Amino acid sequence: RDLAEELRIKNLVEPYFNEYALSQTVFVLKNNEEMLYQLVSGGLRRLGEFMTIYTTENFRNLKVVSSPAVSVGISLKSDLLELKIHSDEMSREELAYLLSKYDRKKKYIRLKNGDFLNIEEDGLSTLAEVSEDLRLTETNLKKGTLIVPKYRAMYLDAALKNNQLLSIEKNKEFKGMVRNMKTIEDSDYEVPEALNSIMRSYQKNGFLWLKTLRENGFGGILADDMGLGKTLQVISLLTAEQQEMQAGEKELRRSLIVCPASLVYNWQKEITRFAPQLKTVIVAGSVPDRASIIRHSKEGEILITSYDLLKRDAEVYQKFVFAIQVIDEAQYIKNPSTQAAKGVKKITAAFKLALTGTPIENRLSELWSIFDYLMPGFLYTYQKFREEIELPIAVNQDANKMERLQRMIRPFILRRLKGDVLKDLPEKIEENVFARLDGEQMQLYDAYATRMKEMLSQQNEKEFHKGRMQILSELTKLRQLCCDPGLLLEDYHGESAKTDMCMELIVNAVGAGHKILLFSQFTSM
């Protein structure tokens, strides 16, 4: 016996079998489909180079077959996509079965007759991923013609692009919309004339992006770095919308801006500054006052309110259909279970936009909540999203899942950093942010201001000059009350408009990776 040769042959055979009967010197392959596939797909051929192999008829009938040629038709009809999946080599039922059984971790699919279908490097794997991402069930696939939301168009175009093993047919409406989304800078939309000389090049591109989303019926996230002028880009869109409504090209409707309370009046000032022809309405005051303001607002006006007030007034807003709804500092709805998040999602609007200065792709639960506001269902239910996308990415660092998620969301997020647009920026960007006193802080300021006026009214000229230091002291107290009443009153625990706004700016800046240098005449703040 040639023991060395026997050992060599044994080592060649062993990888294809999972049991070895020592007493009978027999290898056994038992209950292991993966090893059976390896044996049938290439193992027998390799072993046959060294030995004579005898098989039963049943075993000889096991085959490894190639994937069928599949054609995919995509049509845009109104606001829906029609998807047709077809193969001349098998029935719809068989094709649906294959797609439902696809597992990207495997190299094959076991057919009902026992044969193996090779799915390595073929169009079927791409189609199966699309089927999974679109949540197409085997029952859906058996129909042959599928209806999916229009917002899947860019994903489908990217997922099926350049796949030589799939035959893709697209109707002209679908190709036209995709072309518009991909060539935004070449679009025919025009920046409003009054703003054209004010806006920087990247801001004009931002307007074109917003306008393209608006006209195609998609929502979006404008996530430019802090200081790059997201507000001005939104104002340009609101201006264009108003011009089209006045020209009769669009139905006359209100728009709605929702932001932190500290930014409500800042939004009004910025709109008045850049587009004074736009009519803004602040929704504030008591519950009856706010309801009256909303109900008596006119079509074409821009309502501005805070997250806190909107969640209380959501029922009143639900009676209207808005042209544009903007949520500023969109991280306010990062927790979908909060009343603020539920409130903004109850509003009906033709176009929904979210603004944020911080990157959101790495905070997946926040990303889901924002897209649930923009285009409900786009990222499925949160339970499905968490199980199938968030946890695999966060826990297992699943690169394939991350790439597929990016492919879905990429067309609907625009983020430019300062480093990306340096040539368009001045040496220094200055921005004035206005804080409006309210509530207890305003009452304290009014009380101290009234007391000072009474004191001054009772002084003659001589007393006035003699008491100048006291007057300066009283003026300092008023300034302290404006900054934060806690500077003057140790037991004050109420709100401070300027401190609250300052903290929001700091939190957002730090969240975007910026460093902060803070100056104040009252360092005890």
Predicted segments, located by residue:
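ASCE P-loop NTPase motor core, strongest for the SF2 helicase catalytic module
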Residues: 165-398, 404-525
